[in-house]
Amino acid sequence: MQKEKIIQELEELKNDNRFRTIKTNDKSLYNFSSNDYLGLAHDKDLLQKFYQNYNFDNYKLSSFSSRLIDGSYLTVMRLEKKVEEIYGKPCLVFNSGFDANSSVIETFFDKKSLIITDRLNHASIYEGCINSRAKILRYKHLDVSALEKLLKKYSEDYDDILVVTETVYSMDGDCSDIKKICDLKDEYNFNLMVDEAHSYGVYGYGIAYNEKLVDKIDFLVIPLGKAGASVGAYVICDEVYKNYLINKSKKFIYSTALPPVNNLWNLFILENLVNFQDRIEKFQELVTFSLSMLKKLNLKTKSTTHIISIIIGDNLNTVNLSNNLKELGYLAYAIKEPTVPKDTARLRISLTADMKKEDIEKFFKTLKAEMKKIGVI
């Protein structure tokens, strides 16, 4: 490792407006960048109910060891059992969505395997693909026909094929048709992995659950750091796969388990999810209103969900736009390469259930005015 080379690389990132820094958010800003979609993490009444329900003297702030040593306490076992009751398949809790996604792929697939992945899948999925040393093929984003062409071409050449998709995509705010992908399993022999990071909670137990597709999905991954208002992830799969992960997944075996209090909160949210239906319906009204407002203002987006992507293109213009909005009281982060493809830098705007229509309307009108000022519309 050459320090001079690292310094040069960091300078290049700065010159290209791609240098990342860690900042403390100003809580006075109106937040259009939060992934707390249902507003659960900031619901004081909900938190109070949680605190009143349990004697926290019994719940430690660390598990002190991995699940295979002394970290598999009663709370996490109850949580996994509850997930199994709801989804009809065994569950294994991982420390994060990143660990869950990468672990599934790198544990079950190897250099003899073929992995076919949506081009815009999350970095955690690509991490697993690379670590597995499998052959990797990417299909055009959301294009099930392109996926089928690859399956038709390669299905005879590989005994071990994995197809990976997300439900809601976090940078474009669009959705995959997992029903169509599941239907391909009737004709082609492959394993299917689905990541529901940005749909769990927003759509109740998730899109796969709502469309009764859990049985057709070999690995259903549900990260909890978005609408789940927490940390960790569920991997929902057959018992034999769960046992294999317990015995072979390095990230599971060698990681200190999540603290009991975190999984107690995960269990509390899971058990109360059925009570959030009014909140979910109100949230979907906000989504419909926002997309309608964008159309009315002639602001273009490919988004169809609660994540609204406004593509600017140029890094500097996107950063300047984000900074200008911050000066006006809005937090809307600029997303740049390599998180998104080159020349597609954007504002990623996320809605939350505790927003008001009048505030959303005011924000989008302000956004349009600022876009005009810097000459991007």
Which positions does each model-derived feature cover?
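PLP-dependent enzyme catalytic core of the Aspartate aminotransferase-like
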Residues: 40-44, 48, 52, 81, ...
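Conserved N-terminal alpha-helix of the aminotransferase class I/II PLP-enzyme fold
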Residues: 54-97, 287
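Active-site PLP attachment segment
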Residues: 213-244
